Amino acid sequence: MARIAGINIPDQKHTVIALTSIYGIGKTRSQAICAAAGIAEHVKISELSEEQIDKLRDEVAKYVVEGDLRREVTLSIKRLMDLGTYRGLRHRRGLPVRGQRTKTNARTRKGPRKPIKK
């Protein structure tokens, strides 16, 4: 298994698909990384040479991925909450942030139903 950005990349998958196992890299960014490194998308990770894997590592290092990206997202949400913005209040209350209805639905964000005590 190749190790890129602190993640074990699956050997048996094609390069484009395997790179998407890194948090912060989707299919489009993965294709861009492969193009920049000069690696064909349909080649499996196990077929790559160590030099090609190093090129992939260098290209992935140019992006904010994994722990740094998670930290960045968490800090931006915390900043919204500290500022007291509407979005921050919705995050704090555990409600949908982007204007979805809450009279019905919104169960994923709100959690399981709580029975009404009489």
Curated annotation (Swiss-Prot):
GO terms for biological process: translation. Located at the top of the head of the 30S subunit, it contacts several helices of the 16S rRNA. In the 70S ribosome it contacts the 23S rRNA (bridge B1a) and protein L5 of the 50S subunit (bridge B1b), connecting the 2 subunits; these bridges are implicated in subunit movement. Contacts the tRNAs in the A and P-sites. Belongs to the universal ribosomal protein uS13 family. NCBIfam families: uS13_bact. This is Small ribosomal subunit protein uS13. Residues 91-118 are annotated as: Disordered. PANTHER family: 30S RIBOSOMAL PROTEIN S13/40S RIBOSOMAL PROTEIN S18, SMALL RIBOSOMAL SUBUNIT PROTEIN US13M. Keywords: Ribonucleoprotein, Ribosomal protein, RNA-binding, rRNA-binding, tRNA-binding. Part of the 30S ribosomal subunit. Forms a loose heterodimer with protein S19. Forms two bridges to the 50S subunit in the 70S ribosome. GO terms for molecular function: rRNA binding; structural constituent of ribosome; tRNA binding. Pfam families: Ribosomal_S13 (PF00416). GO terms for cellular component: cytosol; small ribosomal subunit. InterPro entries: Rbsml_uS13_C (IPR027437), Ribosomal_uS13 (IPR001892), Ribosomal_uS13-like_H2TH (IPR010979), Ribosomal_uS13_bac-type (IPR019980), Ribosomal_uS13_CS (IPR018269).
